Amino acid sequence: MAMALQIIASSSSSPTITKSHLFSYPPLQSRYKASKPNLSSWFSLLGSSRFSPYIGLKHLGISISPKSSNPEKKRRCKSMMIRASLFGVGAPEALVIGVVALLVFGPKGLAEVARNLGKTLRTFQPTIRELQDVSRDFKSTLEREIGLDDISTPNVYNQNRTNPVQPPPPPPPPSVPSTEAPVTANDPNDSQSPKAYTSEDYLKFTEEQLKALSPAESQTEDQTQTQEPPQPTTVQTPTGESQPNGTARETTAASPPRQD
């Protein structure tokens, strides 16, 4: 404060202050030099430990407990809270319900109500156990199915990665009818490939074959006629017996004429 008052007094006495006057002010330089060892002592106290924002607050006298980021502890606390509650009703809620029941039924009525509740619970105890068993079985089956689904999905993903889906082959191009004549296989002895025959060529070949067959048929007929021997003609005699032509002549020549 004294330093500030001196600066104000000097400014009021002389409105213009030079830079050399400010930098040569003795109290500021002494204060700045005195602050250096304090910083070095701070860093020596810290040492080689890890720097955290709470260390400086501890030196100032302020203590802040850092929040724990352990999820396991949170889960344990939640499970303890769930175990402490009965059917979703905790200890304070149960106490409030008991006080209200005492006010409504009274001590005698509350005892009777508790007895009736005990009897009903005893009667329904086997059914409750059956329901618990059914719920456990259902829960186990659900967990198994979920586990199988979780196991099958990575297997399918790995199979898809190892065996990528191949694209379907492209469809074959449409067949275009060829206008060119079919080319037959070349014989090794032929130097030129034979050309395709037209309908006129086929007609010529058939006519030539018919002409070649007609003289062959006539020759075969002549040969069959020459090979067959001449059959003798039969002549009937006056006696009524049939004789060949040559024998009839001989008999006529040999037999004398009849005289009446």
UniProtKB/Swiss-Prot annotation:
Biased composition (Pro residues): 165-176
InterPro entries named in the record: TatA/B/E (IPR003369), TatA/E (IPR006312)
Region annotation (Disordered) ranges: 146-260
Residue intervals annotated with topology Lumenal: 84-85
GO cellular component, one term: TAT protein transport complex
Similarity remark: Belongs to the TatB family.
Compartment annotation: Plastid, Chloroplast thylakoid membrane
Pfam families xrefs: TatA_B_E (PF02416)
Spans through the membrane: 86-106
Keyword Calcium applies: no
Domain of life assignment: Eukaryota
Compositional bias per record (Low complexity), positions renumbered to this chain: 221-239
Biased composition (Polar residues): 152-163, 186-196, 240-254
Topology of the protein relative to the lipid bilayer: Single-pass membrane protein
Basic and acidic residues compositional bias, start-end: 201-210
Native organism taxonomy: Eukaryota, Viridiplantae, Streptophyta, Embryophyta, Tracheophyta
Protein name: Sec-independent protein translocase protein TATB, chloroplastic
The protein's role, per its UniProt record: Part of the twin-arginine translocation (Tat) system that transports large folded proteins containing a characteristic twin-arginine motif in their signal peptide across the thylakoid membrane. Involved in delta pH-dependent protein transport required for chloroplast development, especially thylakoid membrane formation. TATC and TATB mediate precursor recognition, whereas TATA facilitates translocation.
